[in-house]
Amino acid sequence: MALFTPWKLSSQKLGFFLVTFGFIWGMMLLHFTIQQRTQPESSSMLREQILDLSKRYIKALAEENRNVVDGPYAGVMTAYDLKKTLAVLLDNILQRIGKLESKVDNLVVNGTGTNSTNSTTAVPSLVALEKINVADIINGAQEKCVLPPMDGYPHCEGKIKWMKDMWRSDPCYADYGVDGSTCSFFIYLSEVENWCPHLPWRAKNPYEEADHNSLAEIRTDFNILYSMMKKHEEFRWMRLRIRRMADAWIQAIKSLAEKQNLEKRKRKKVLVHLGLLTKESGFKIAETAFSGGPLGELVQWSDLITSLYLLGHDIRISASLAELKEIMKKVVGNRSGCPTVGDRIVELIYIDIVGLAQFKKTLGPSWVHYQCMLRVLDSFGTEPEFNHANYAQSKGHKTPWGKWNLNPQQFYTMFPHTPDNSFLGFVVEQHLNSSDIHHINEIKRQNQSLVYGKVDSFWKNKKIYLDIIHTYMEVHATVYGSSTKNIPSYVKNHGILSGRDLQFLLRETKLFVGLGFPYEGPAPLEAIANGCAFLNPKFNPPKSSKNTDFFIGKPTLRELTSQHPYAEVFIGRPHVWTVDLNNQEEVEDAVKAILNQKIEPYMPYEFTCEGMLQRINAFIEKQDFCHGQVMWPPLSALQVKLAEPGQSCKQVCQESQLICEPSFFQHLNKDKDMLKYKVTCQSSELAKDILVPSFDPKNKHCVFQGDLLLFSCAGAHPRHQRVCPCRDFIKGQVALCKDCL
């Protein structure tokens, strides 16, 4: 074991240690001396550096947000308010500056006893002032949010009230920047859901800007459409119709492009879902199309699809639930109360009543975000009274087809019979080729009539009426089937004819004879287009769901005054003679007059290919149910009429050769609006009813509409005068006013 030897301090080692210690002590003394002498300069420089960095920091933030307008919630489509963000940052910077300056000043005062007059006394008060303002902002205080006028945005006020109560019901509202303030509600409702006017100081929505990048260009061939429709056997009848009419369609789109500017139109993403052709619907329309089944819906669908395609829009066609789910898979199951952001799957949806139920079930909660895009093909129309679920229930209506709570103008009809809806229409087909057209003009009219009724039961109890006609001319028919018990023996029955053969027969014929059924079909228009006069049976009393089984369950109380109201009202004599079948003298006088007149073929423009293209293009470009403001038709078309008690707005407008325009009701729903048209309201109230706005002339009492979905051209008030918005229309294009294009 080694012994420990104690260390002995030599004089040499001691000297080295003392020298080293002395050197270190001297350097430290020198350092503190220099530091004390330069302290005032260092504190000043430090302050300047901090302030300079702060300025540069704020400047950098400003540069990064140069395109964002200042004000509350100035960031577009974000969950953050730039002012609040900067407030927090500035608050942090000011706190640090305050602490640093306090320490520096203490060093200066305590360390040197000089420079006690440094201009720092104002800083604490400035900092305190800033802290108060910053704290106010952080705690939710906002600068005053000046809201623009809400004229033209009838839903805005109601939506704001709803947001005040319900904005916490879904976290998605906060994600869009909603924080409980009116301004945040307004920004959300103007930029995300489009119910309110856009605030002028706000930057534009980048998603809306992106949406306008792709433009529609007209198409002049059908190759892509044929390929698309070939995949479905259900489309066979429609595909054949489109092929037959292809030349006429292409000529029509070229002609329309020469007459009006079809450039700079946004190319829309369009979904077409034919619910009636799905297997789940239970209908056999596609299967019976070639064997005498109903064709009206297929005619309208094929003409709509053709129009959308030629106008240059991107269309996707669905005829099964599987296809519908595949197209909409991105949003199926989305339970958010807010719409999805970014590239839209679809922007327009054409659908039928059957498909509507399928669409709602498929989308689930997401349905609400697509309601405004819907355009529902609805032959007989849906009146507001049946569309509004609560109102329909309160009236005891049990129709399976109504209660959708859409804007009534989203329902597209076969004829312009329901002004609360939109008139889509169809094209009356010309079945002739170029050589036929040359030959058909040489055909001489014979002293013969053709009866409109291909089913034997339509002829029941009509012999006396037909006997009168037979007194003056031959009677022909196109009845199919073995049963002919109701057909008089003198009738020459041709059976089912092809479209081409039917047109040649019509060219030989002077009179097309209505039997009272079917209602509102396309055949009378084909007859008139081939130079026939149409004998149109009058209904007295008018037929409706109140007295006719055929209309029971349909979502309308519309009254038909004749077999073909469109022909009666919008065409009339000399082409259309509306008569009471039970008045033998009236029938005989009409037949004599028709035999003594010479009329040319007439086709209303709205039932031609070009007319339909023009109308659908106007609807796509102008109709907008996803934004709050109603901008079309233009207000210049408004003509106000007062209906007498017991008279509907549809009637009073029609008497003046005008159309009731439901879009204008919102401009007649306030005291000040009434004054413009010399109606003075000494008192007023709100009511949720289809018969308002109305005016009681005895008491000068006005009743205004409390529910915008109940504005209705139909319905007559028993005591008040209804205040009615009418408009003019283009002859042969009823859906459009003279200033609408």
Swiss-Prot record:
Record note on what altering E280A does: Decreased catalytic activity
Notes on temperature effects: Optimum temperature is 50 degrees Celsius.
Inducing factors: Induced by IFNG treatment in monocytes (in vitro).
Domain of life: Eukaryota
Residue ranges that the UniProt entry lists as topological domain Cytoplasmic: 1-13
SS bond list: C145-C183, C156-C196, C172-C338, C372-C626, C649-C724, C653-C726, C660-C713, C681-C702, C737-C740
InterPro entries: GT18_cat, MGAT5_Glycosyltransferase, MGT5A-like_N
Membrane topology field: Single-pass type II membrane protein
EC number: 2.4.1.155
Regulation: Activity is increased by Mn(2+) and Mg(2+).
Topology Lumenal: residue spans: 31-741
Record's keyword annotation contains Transmembrane helix: yes
Glycosylation sites: N110, N115, N118, N334, N433, N447
Effect of E526A: Loss of catalytic activity
Residue numbers binding UDP-N-acetyl-alpha-D-glucosamine: E526
Result for mutant: L29D: No effect on the biosynthesis of the secreted form
pH behavior: Optimum pH is 6.5.
Mutagenesis or variant effect for H31A: No effect on the biosynthesis of the secreted form
Subcellular location: Golgi apparatus membrane
Stretches for region Important for activity in FGF2 release: 264-269
Protein role: Catalyzes the addition of N-acetylglucosamine (GlcNAc) in beta 1-6 linkage to the alpha-linked mannose of biantennary N-linked oligosaccharides. Catalyzes an important step in the biosynthesis of branched, complex-type N-glycans, such as those found on EGFR, TGFR (TGF-beta receptor) and CDH2. Via its role in the biosynthesis of complex N-glycans, plays an important role in the activation of cellular signaling pathways, reorganization of the actin cytoskeleton, cell-cell adhesion and cell migration.
Family (UniProt): Belongs to the glycosyltransferase 18 family.
Name of this chain's protein: Alpha-1,6-mannosylglycoprotein 6-beta-N-acetylglucosaminyltransferase A
Native source species: Homo sapiens
